[in-house]
From Swiss-Prot:
Beta toxins bind voltage-independently at site-4 of sodium channels (Nav) and shift the voltage of activation toward more negative potentials thereby affecting sodium channel activation and promoting spontaneous and repetitive firing. Residues 1-64 form the LCN-type CS-alpha/beta domain. Has the structural arrangement of an alpha-helix connected to antiparallel beta-sheets by disulfide bonds (CS-alpha/beta). SUPFAM superfamilies: Scorpion toxin-like. Keywords: Disulfide bond, Ion channel impairing toxin, Neurotoxin, Secreted, Toxin, Voltage-gated sodium channel impairing toxin. One of its GO terms (biological process) is defense response. GO terms for cellular component: extracellular region. It comes from the Eukaryota. GO terms for molecular function: sodium channel inhibitor activity; toxin activity. This is Putative beta-neurotoxin RjAa1.
Length: 65
């Protein structure tokens, strides 16, 4: 599984071309994952996630920002 990790506010985690920051964010939530900064979305994107990982979904978006 893969997807955008969410911050405490339910929003995607913003980044500006900083893959290491995103890798740390992803691994803080899911140890075996990897992550990078998705340039077009300016948001962190995680890969190699467990099937039950909760990631941002446009259909259930509760982001207030």
């Amino acid at each position: 599984k893969e997807g955008y990790p969410m911050g405490r506010n339910g929003c995607k985690i913003s980044c500006v071309i900083n893959n290491n920051f995103c890798k740390v964010e992803c691994q803080a939530k899911w140890r075996q994952s990897d992550g990078y900064c998705y340039f077009w979305g300016l948001s962190c994107y995680c890969t190699n996630l467990p099937d039950d990982a909760q990631v941002w979904d446009s259909s259930t978006n509760k982001c207030g920002g």
